[in-house]
Structure formats: structure tokens, C-alpha cells
Amino acid sequence: MGRNQRERKQERERRKQERRWTARVFEGPPTGPDVVTPSFQEVVAALETMPQELTWDQIAPEVVPLFQRVRPYHPEMPEQLRMVVPPGLSVGFGVDIGPAFITVSPEMADEWGIGPDEILERALANLEARMDGVRPRDVYDGSIGDVPVRMLQSPTGSASTYVLVPDALGRIFGTHRQLVLAPMRNLLLSLPIGADRDFAAWLFDEIASQDPNCLAPAAFVIGDGQLSLEPLGESYGAA
């Protein structure tokens, strides 16, 4: 066991004994004027509702898949448990506590005795259950210039990963082939399949540039329950 891993384990044991959470704040870049984020107090209040020892049975209903943001995490943040899922997407996992996620680390999975495949299966099932609650009125229909754009925003950071369940997403956006963008964790945009890719890249960048936690520039093609991945180009994206 490496020093950092050992120190984190000792810190968890100390918190268990004290029966309270501790918080460390790592300041990041400011968000854009149109991005709303939870306050520190809201995050701490949510953490205080969680048990000190997070067992699999307790947190399994709230585990969801997460796409990795572009901006690197602080080096003192826990390592993330990650998997690569079709069609070549890197996926991590978080415990949804409302205003934030608790990162699932390899260490936590080892303590639970739960393998990554089982965590992925449960996370996707939880995701699909959330998607079942999306109503037609939750999808905003608009246009930018002469391009129709449909938007879906989730109250938590799950919307971006809805593409991992293309059948369920088809019930929301329709089963036709379409281009889907996920510039932020809680936002999906649907464009016509024939939309100009330079326009799509510009739109992605316009939104992602406001969010320091933006996702990697990529486009998803969905339709008939299938999912494929398209690059948006190295010159785009708010890295």
C-alpha cells in the first residue's frame, strides 16, 4: 500500500471514530454567468446526511456513471474507479447526494467486495430508472439560427450519460438518427443528424467554455437504440 493510500485509509478511520465528515476545499476557476452551481454550505449539508461508513447496500441505489471532465482534478483528490465501455467511452462512478457526487474509488470497491462490472450494471440500471421519470415537457425545443436544437437538462449531473442507455434515450429524444452533444454533465443537446459539424463544435464550445467542469469535446450519434462516437476536433472544447 502506497503512502497516499495508507494516509487516506487512516483519515477515513479517524472520521469514523469522530463520527463526522471533514471537508477540504480546492478552489477552481470561476463559472460563467449562465452556470448555476451549489454553494459550499449546500454540499456540506448534503454530506452530513450521509452515513460515515458508505456500505454498498446503502449507496447502491444512488450510484450513477459519470463522464470525466476535461480539467484535471486536484492531485489530493481520491483516484477514480474507471472503466471503458462501448463505443470506447471512459466512465467513472459517483454517489449522487443531490448537489454533488461522492467519487467511487478503487479502494471503496475493494472494501465493498464489488467488482467494476457489477458497479457498472447497477449504475446503468439506476440511470435508466431516472430516465423513466423524464417527461416530454422536460425537453426544450428551440433553434439556433436555422438549426433545430432540443435541450434536456437534469437536476443532477446525470443527463450527459443518458447516451449510455440509447434505447431509453430514444424514448425521450425519438428513435431517429440524431447528433447529440454533452458539453456539461447535466446537459444534453440534440441536433439533426445532418447538422454542420463545425456548427456543432462551435455550439459545444460556447456552452462548455462557461463551465470549468466541462466534458471532453465529442459528439454522439444515436438512433434505433444504437450509439456511436464522433470527434469534434482538437481546436474545440474548453480544456
Question: Predicted segment positions?
Answer:
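Short glycine-rich, basic-tinged beta-strand/loop micro-motifs
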Residues: 144-150, 181-189
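Charged, alpha-helical interface segments at or near domain boundaries
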Residues: 18-157
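Short, surface-exposed loop and linker segments with low hydrophobicity and enrichment for Pro/Ser/Thr
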Residues: 81-85, 168-175
